[in-house]
Structure formats: structure tokens, C-alpha cells
Amino acid sequence: MKLNIIAVGALTKEYKTLYEIYNKKVSFFSTINLIEIKEVTEPNIELKIKKETKLILEKIPKNSKVFYMSLTGKKMKSEEFASLLCEDNLTFIIGGSNGVEEKYFDNKICFSDLTFPHQLFRVILIEQIYRGFAINNNIKYHK
């Protein structure tokens, strides 16, 4: 199974430690290819969004089913999210702090109405990926 996470920005040491804890757990089921896009320094927000979106689109692996993590996306329970992980070649996208041009992304997922810091959200995403694999493999983790 191929899983990709494309995210704008890099994790600080503290968040990277948390991310790696779950990445190690996920590694029993799949390898996650993490692609970090450098945040664009641009005072014009609209132009910044366009540039970051272009960089993201260039990094999406061929034939990958893409899910953009968005406040306007579909809300789902952990079991439904777990069912997505039965497919191969998935890419999850976490845009920059100003978002992306959403018109390029048909599949959108929303984990919450709350807004999270992007670094924390990356940890939340990989935890949910692990939770999904635990559900699919009947591992006692999800309650």
C-alpha cells in the first residue's frame, strides 16, 4: 500500500517526535511518503495560495487518489476513514496556513469544525491513519 502526505511547511523537533511515534506504528501496515513543500514567502496572499497549490499539484504521485484536508470537507467517523485505507496509492494534502485553491481537489475531508495549527494537524492525521489501520486489522486501539 502506498500512502503519501503532502504538507506545506516543516515540523519543529517537538512535533516531529510525535509524528515519528505514529509513523513507526503505521510502518507495520504501510510506508508513508512524506513530501514537505517549503512555505512560499509572498506578501500577496492570493499569489501565495496559487504558488503553493502549484507546488502541491506537481508533487502528487501519478494515479493517486487525493484527499485534501479542508474545513469544507466531508466529516466522517473513524470507521469510515478506515475504509479509505483499504485502497492503494492515497495522497492526503495539508495546505499552507492560507489554504489552497480548492477547485483542484474533488475529495475533501474535514476532521473537525475547529481550526488546528498545521504542525499539530499533521500529527492528528497520522494518528487517524494509524487508528484506521488498527480498526481494519482488529487491533485494540480504537474504542
Curated annotation (Swiss-Prot):
Subcellular compartments: Cytoplasm
Domain of life: Bacteria
Gene Ontology annotations for the cellular component aspect, listed alphabetically: cytoplasm
Known partners and oligomeric status: Homodimer.
Family: Belongs to the RNA methyltransferase RlmH family.
Disulfide bonds: none
EC number, as in UniProt: 2.1.1.177
Keywords of this entry: Cytoplasm, Methyltransferase, rRNA processing, S-adenosyl-L-methionine, Transferase
Pfam families from the UniProt entry: SPOUT_MTase
Enzyme class label: transferase
Catalytic reaction(s) noted: pseudouridine(1915) in 23S rRNA + S-adenosyl-L-methionine = N(3)-methylpseudouridine(1915) in 23S rRNA + S-adenosyl-L-homocysteine + H(+)
Function: Specifically methylates the pseudouridine at position 1915 (m3Psi1915) in 23S rRNA.
Name this protein carries in UniProt: Ribosomal RNA large subunit methyltransferase H
Species the sequence originates in: Metamycoplasma arthritidis (strain 158L3-1)
GO MF terms held by the record: rRNA (pseudouridine-N3-)-methyltransferase activity
